[in-house]
Amino acid sequence: MSEPTEHTRATISVSSKGTQLGEIVLRFYHDVAPGHVKNFTTLAQEGFYNGTTFHRVIPGFMVQGGDPNSKDSDRASHGMGGPGHRVKAEFNSKPHKRGVLSMARSNDPDSAGSQFFICVADANFLDWQYTAFGEVVTGLDVADKVVTMKRDGRDNPLERVEMTVTITE
């Protein structure tokens, strides 16, 4: 697996109930968050994200995915899984505006693993608190579709919204 460059892109193919909702294409901020970019692209190249879901969607805020527990139909554990390793925080000056890709974490700043989120609205209260490591190039309308889906009390969509992630140069 090669090192990510400024030309590296990720394509998230999104589907629900066997119907394609579209693709979200991402470019990365490898200059300010190289560890997070490397982690995400490596996990994607290994197929880690394939079959995971967008397990947390909050209108006016973001869509979150990347939890391996979301492959299980038991939603009680969704949002609690990871890859078995952590990535050190790389907080940076990139603002959490609409379309920004950032890494989810627990209260520990150095606890990011595999879960990520895409802002569907500006969220500057996250600046310098979470690691922004990329942005949507095309397909933000797909995230907008996902964020409006009916969800349960934990903001988990009632219908599975699965992803497949591929990396290209």
Predicted regions and their residues:
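Cyclophilin-like peptidyl-prolyl cis-trans isomerases
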Residues: 1-169
